[in-house]
Amino acid sequence: MIERMWDPEVRVSGSLATVWTPYDFYNGAQFSHCGVDVVTMIHNGERWEIKSLDFNRQQPPTCELHPDGPPGG
């Protein structure tokens, strides 16, 4: 299984941060789906901790595929 993310948008406000990034997902060489991952993080004073990971699953053209094309290609 291969999940590739690209062009993350990171926003930070004090101890709160989010990362929004498109992704595509392959099962071996076979395309499965694509969508968006959203990660919410909190800084605990020492390090960033992931508090939630949310995502959606879509099919093109609703979502975009990785700009480099299929993995290994």
Regions found by a protein language model. Give the residues of each.
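Short beta-strand edge/turn micro-motifs at domain boundaries
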Residues: 36-64
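Short, low-complexity N-terminal intrinsically disordered segments enriched in polar/charged residues
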Residues: 67-73
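Surface-exposed, charged secondary-structure patches
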Residues: 1-32
